[in-house]
């Protein structure tokens, strides 16, 4: 076990109520000493004599849910002043941790002969070991067990029976006990009757195992009594070939078997949770032609219960919080449990510059995962963003994938899911309310103590009475400059009429009006924080660092200054946990975080990726998606997400379509769902347009190769595409430097349609690579922007407009100049002009403004007319 995990130790808990019984205390001390001697981490959990049944049961549940504990024994009797149902308490112990073997499940398995799939009670197990040590074969022998207790007699009978002895159980109602004993080749007693079995009863040469513990008066002893067994030892030893003394016979073996069961439990735990060892079943698709709508397909498939899927992929029951039958949240503690395990292969799916309809990155992500898992027998996880309600109800639609490559249930995925976006909306708007409330009260109320930290203001004093008037003002008032406020209210709906609003119109606000706006929720910095955080504490720190405005003296104002970061953390405490769902074919999917890819970094959460990489094991794959084209989502994935996660991808999958390449090759702009008139070129073969449009594909392959990662091009095939068009794209992609290029039909065929893509990805993951970032984080802000513009977009240069130059100076002065860059620009072109397709050249990229997402950890320059509220 140490070889698999040097930090691993079997864990044992002994639960005792009261602790006033000397005999129980003695037994426990012996067990704890033995555990310590062999390296078991043993804990004595002592509950007070006043403990109620529910308190005892809750303690047991806590131990059941502790993955570092592999054995739990409940010391009997339960010495409580309250009425306790011992049977109920005993059966509350998880069967896989019941190293005493006393639960009904373990007893039942023993009775049925499932000796290899249960824990055998320690005393009978020790007795069997003693019998084996004599050299006598149990098979065919006559055995007599006196007593039928659940601890000794009943399990001893079962154990002897399934070792092929002919067994008789004797008890208080047995007639002519002496005659029955006289037939026994093997005699085991456990009745609690001092020296009841006489030597003359015993068959000559028999094996006698005495499990009785009885106290009888003895004036020669200091305490006036001595311990004897159920057998009269002096006379019995003359008849028996082997006999155990009392004390010192069975007792040490009982302790030894307890240690053995604990180690066995730990071994079973390691085997069951071996890295990458999944016991997963996949769902066979019933493909229909023509392919039905996404919602029809989704509803036609019955998903596995999500708790079953969680168990199949190695999650423990207490690590999973169920939200109904088809979705669940996964506890962050999973990362700690799996910390020593090696990560799997990391794949990011991106695309060429898309049409407004999208080119199928999500569909390809799910199709690839289904191919790798259900068809190529690899452990694989999809990690995708949670979609915003705005685009879901817009032209782009949902983000669950499509056809026979989607996440199900589709409605759950695309709408509320587990409420993460609603939590972000509440948290974001709490900050907005706090900003306006603070400005209102500072302008209408007398001086009060505030929350700004002394050290931040350069006030090196701790005694308030020594503050000067200036220092008091600086400490008590944030003095927010209304013109500097960058924090906006949000909602998860595309509502163009909220792009500019006026707040404070009520008479109660005493004329404190200002213009503001509503952004879409996924544009909130809190969403970016959620996606980039690595722990609850890290999220708390990031939320506290979010800059919402600047004071009139130029000091950045944070949520910490507003006194709301604690409340934000509480609002986000559940949202930080990744959401578990599944594909149509039964593969696991993490759906977590959904920052926009144009104004934020456009990637799902770091936490989801990290948990998934541990769960799949070193030979498995995690496939995640970067929003929009490679120039947007992929660049930010590498330069922002990978910087903060420390993860390095093995493969880039670049999705292309014939439709988009024809548009980039000079075809009409795709703007709607209907293809008529001059858009018929998208329906019929046109190799010339495809070849010209591959300039965009070539540029995006080049962009991916800037980071030193192999690129596999996935051509998402539509039924209107010709074979010649698909092969031409694959040929040109390889010539552009792609590791491989493969046509895919996963939309129509599910995972089977992406098998060749899966094989290509597996090969690429084994290819040598040398990952590197595009720019040094310590470069000046302008230089970092210029590098992205020139190397990724193909711009000649950048132009900083006055507002942008002011922000560069301000953020550099405030200490934010070393943050990575998150360009906010249109996703419909490599340039800032959405109408320019293909590979635009000869342009200067205008930077009209720059904003800071200090909590998330990046600066985002605003390019062109990019909006933060949907159309």
Which residues fall in each region the model found?
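Flexible phosphate-sensing "switch/lid" loops adjacent to ATP/NTP-binding sites
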Residues: 276-871
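Short glycine-/small-residue-rich Rossmann-like dinucleotide-binding loops
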Residues: 77, 190-193, 212-213, 627, ...
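Conserved hydrophobic helix-helix packing surfaces used for dimerization/oligomerization
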Residues: 12, 138, 142-143, 347, ...
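Glycine-rich phosphate/diphosphate-binding loop of Rossmann-like nucleotide-binding domains
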Residues: 17-37, 49, 113-211, 216-234
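A short, aliphatic-rich alpha-helical micro-motif
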Residues: 66, 181-182, 203, 341-342, ...
